[in-house]
Amino acid sequence: MVNRLYTLILSILLSISAIASTQPRLTIVVIVDGMTQDNLTAMRPYWSAGGLRLMSEEAFQTTATFPHQVYGGQETTATLMTGTIPAHHGIMADHYFSRSERKPIPILHDKQASGIGTHIQLSPRDILSTTVTDEWRMLRGTQAQIYAIGLQPEATILMAGHAANACCWLDAETHKWVTTSFYPEGLPAAADEMNMSGRIDLLAEREWTPRMDISMYNHPTDKERKRGFTYFNKEHLLHTPVANTLVIEMALALQQSKQLGIDMQPDLLLLQLTTLSPQSASDAIESAEQEDMYMGLNQDLGFLIEQLNRRIGKEQYQIMVIGRPVKGYSTATLEMANLPVQRFNADRAAALTGTYLMAIYGHERWVDGGHGPFIYLNRI
């Protein structure tokens, strides 16, 4: 079995004000699920216009490697936001196995928090380290405004940290902006207004098809070559270009309503976007629909930059875009390279470990259970 330590890529640092003589009034951190440097290089011919053209104009790029395995969950988001590893920040996956309830529980589950517009109860209370937003608050004080907008609840809360004014994410079931009661502001008024406006439903009802002839894509699958691809956004909303569009529109609505970046107190806005399509089996581009996701991302970032330039001025803000690994390489890609591929079964591993420990230490339930890539012993 190949045990790869993925490189966590801070793949693009887009400094809009190249080396600004004054401190930017607004900093925007954009985490893009599945975005990699290799994909950006492959897609470069498409960047004659749009936000990602800044790669070759005003961007500084760097990479960072974190010494822990990537399991496809939000442990990487937590590492990015805290600057430390799961052993210290406490977020090792999306779920953990509860010894008391004997079942998987969302890693950020909090019975003290209520969902606003959603039934799930989540909060950042179990993040053990300070996050970027926490440090920002301690450094800038209460006058700084901090918001996070995302596609998944765990990612959005991890970006918001303990100290944000508010956060909101797009609920996969209701197609509404929702949040947690943990943050003092609750659901931002701009999010509630978009929920009521019908804008989300309007975009969700649209059909997603290739934006150009399928022969012009570099990586169409055999199926796509024959029939292209078609998705109804409502069914796969969080994995279509519309999801990114809605996050960008929400960000701009929030910037306008809260006047982010207008006064001299630096504000912080964090966004989660994605390049992963409904059929993505890998972070690497393996289909036309994944290429189309990158084209949509480029367009949405371009719109964000255009609007911010008009509203607050190019020198008054900066954007950092970070690629977050999620799926790594697909099984087919690894096998193509003649690498041995096996799958870890947590339940089987837990059973075998329990049998082994009983043979050594006596008949007792030494293993409580397993979930994901982890097994849980009966004591810490």
Where are these regions (language model features)?
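Bacterial N-terminal signal peptides
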Residues: 6-17
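Secreted, luminal/periplasmic, and some membrane-associated catalytic domains
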Residues: 32, 94-121, 129, 162, ...
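A long, amphipathic alpha-helix that forms part
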Residues: 39, 47, 237-263, 269, ...
